[in-house]
Amino acid sequence: MDIKVKRVKIFVTVPCENTQEVRKAVCSAWAGIIGEYSYCSTCVKSLGTFIPNNNANPYIWEKNKMEFIEEDKLEFICDIDNVKFVLSELRKVHPYEEPAIDIVPLIDEKDLP
């Protein structure tokens, strides 16, 4: 089966206070479009954990200490040709030094055998 990936779903975790800013940046960069609808996204509450090491430059936390933060996990659809631009715009407004980003290829139902 030879299926070409045309769209992906991008997931990113964001501190709750930055969710709207990240959503706006991503959707302004042409992600979140489904048919005739724009700014389409899903947001799920989550609890993030991490320990910044001595070389890290943490957003507001202490180095070498387990941190817990309430986050939103945003997900949105993106055309494969726009992914790099969308990620660039996302990183401009995301407060984390190393945002957690997942990119999942999607298969259109009409492309299934």
Question: How would you name each of these model-derived features?
Answer:
Residues 1-113:
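Hydrophobic structural segments
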